[in-house]
Amino acid sequence: MASSESNHPYHMVNPSKWPFIGSIAGFIMATGGIYYMHDGSIYPFLFGTALMLYVMYGWWRDVISEAENGLDHTSVVKHGLRVGMVLFITSEVMFFFAFFWAFFDATVPLISRTAHEIWPPEGVVPFAAFGIPFLNTLILLTSGATVTVAHHKIQHGDRSGCGRWLVYTVVLGLAFTALQAYEYVHATFGFTDGIYSSTFYLATGFHGFHVIVGTIFLIVCYFRTQKGHFTADTHLGFEAAAWYWHFVDVVWLFLFVCVYWWGGSGYIPPNSNYWK
């Protein structure tokens, strides 16, 4: 039996409790969220979220442990992990494709008969594209450059330099999130105020969630770098984080151009001659 197990390059996964607990956490999160949306208590949703975070921590801790023992993650397994990350990002692209479809369905008459003749709809005051959104664009583009520098540093075996540039990237990610939160707090429209606000918050909010996840991903990479988990030849976890961060950058460029810039370009102040 031992010889047959070592006669292939695949990782035979040990029994794990995390898939089962994760499914329970997902169920509690979903039902708790629905319950809260129908004027119920938010605590079931928060409990499900906390349980899911615990599962994520434990499961990823085990994966990192498997990677560090030097036996489980063969070249074939690493190739599979890379393919899995690419497919995961592809599935995320489909998510955002749906949000952009909803946005253009509401704005472009050539696509939908239900599209608004005036966009943004009358009464909606959109954000100035070249205010906070443009600043956030510069921040994310800069963070894309800093994470690339960090990648080059680890490729050359410079763990100290990699950690330093990762810190820069994390700080930029936190700055983006803070500015996004400031923008939401000072918005003149709420999520349920119409099709404009719904598509706006869905698209930008989902992206903001990805920025938070990506920032956490990079923070984990920083601590793994400090512990010596990454070398010039072996840093798959860092590669996955960098790919994810670049994906977040690209999505934001589309959001800035389509939702903020083009989507808000038709706004006419109420005191202009158009409304008279």
Regions found by a protein language model. Give the residues of each.
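...captures the hydrophobic TM-helix bundle architecture rather than a specific catalytic motif
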Residues: M1-K276
